Amino acid sequence: MKMHFCIPVSQQRSDALGGRYVLYSVHLDGFLFCRVRYSQLHGWNEQLRRVFGNCLPPFPPKYYLAMTTAMADERRDQLEQYLQNVTMDPNVLRSDVFVEFLKLAQLNTFDIATKKAYLDIFLPNEQSIRIEIITSDTAERVLEVVSHKIGLCRELLGYFGLFLIRFGKEGKLSVVKKLADFELPYVSLGSSEVENCKVGLRKWYMAPSLDSVLMDCRVAVDLLYMQAIQDIEKGWAKPTQAQRQKLEAFQKEDSQTKFLELAREVRHYGYLQLDPCTCDYPESGSGAVLSVGNNEISCCITLPDSQTQDIVFQMSRVKCWQVTFLGTLLDTDGPQRTLNQNLELRFQYSEDSCWQWFVIYTKQAFLLSSCLKKMISEKMVKLAAENTEMQIEVPEQSKSKKYHIQQSQQKDYSSFLSRKSKIKIAKDDCVFGNIKEEDL
């Protein structure tokens, strides 16, 4: 599936010799990721083509005449589509050519030198461990260092992830974003405009049943236990009074296995809860709290009469979704030059044999989209595993089903839409028609 890359703004810049060029601000999951020139992206594409050949998506062509504003805007759209499409191939995502270019782009954008540094990683019990890293270490590498330090089985790394987490008042926490494997945690944390933001370790799967895969690793069980306690304390998981009493008894006994077995029966166990937001049901501006997990989106909606209503959307009935940028551009001469995070996520849902759109307005729209994609991918893995079992029992019948599953894995359920008619362009955000290709 596509990653959440977008280029909402391009800027005209002058080099030391007075020449002009265009700088594209690339955002990932709604946050500034790097700034690059067309020539840099073009060179990167050429490197990728030498490795992967013609399986890459088309790259925007060079212009040898002066570009009009419309042409420049079209190029920006094409570069955005290229970044989204090229990341659909997992082989490209894991390649050295892909990762090394983006590492350098992040470091150069935020003027960070490659050197040794220390990074605090917060565990689910909100205690931290300090690790020594290189500022150019990717999230994948940092996760390996963390796992080695705490003794987590290497083969279980894929079930955990690094997140930017905001710690608020009165013990509240908010998951800001999941760090992509190729992101540099040191850079992403340092460039974040979110107050009290830390890098945290959390499990990264949406199906509570996957806990069973981790139960033979003591450290993994410790992490699950910590996160389960934290989720219950924060109100993300909602045990009944009877369940709470039993859980407290198991906690006093330090019986982690029994605690987790019961926790899996708790409502919203293993779900990720978003910050309070608004939605368009039953009317626009209705308050909502969303919990995502176990193949569903659970919404607690505040009605106009202050009563609450719980609505559950099953992922099996979600056809597609898209994230739309509704905000305005901030001052492009500021230190961060990011976006005013006004986002919506809308998904198409089947209700009584009729497809309807449900709209959620939240700054965590990209995180929500990542959770939906994760649930889809987990479902595909499960179907593939079941298909393998069927293949052993009924080889001929399973062939067609396997092909269908493989095709489904390539389906793109999500999209990013930049609603440009609603974007207020800052003074220097436009690319003027007298900029030529050699200036880029």
From Swiss-Prot:
SMART domains named among the record's database cross-references: PX
InterPro entries xrefs: PH-like_dom_sf, PX_dom, PX_dom_sf, SNX17-31_FERM_F1, SNX17-31_FERM_F2, SNX17/31_FERM
Top-level division of the source organism's lineage: Eukaryota
Any one GO MF annotation of this record: phosphatidylinositol binding
Gene3D superfamilies: 1.20.80.60, Phosphatidylinositol 3-kinase Catalytic Subunit, Chain A, domain 1, Phox-like domain, Pleckstrin-homology domain (PH domain)/Phosphotyrosine-binding domain (PTB)
Cellular component GO terms held in the UniProt record: early endosome; protein-containing complex
Keyword Protein transport part of the UniProt annotation: yes
Assembly and interaction partners: Interacts with CCDC22, CCDC93, VPS26C and VPS35L, associates with the retriever and CCC complexes.
Functional summary from the UniProt entry: May be involved in protein trafficking.
Protein family per UniProt: Belongs to the sorting nexin family.
Name of this protein: Sorting nexin-31
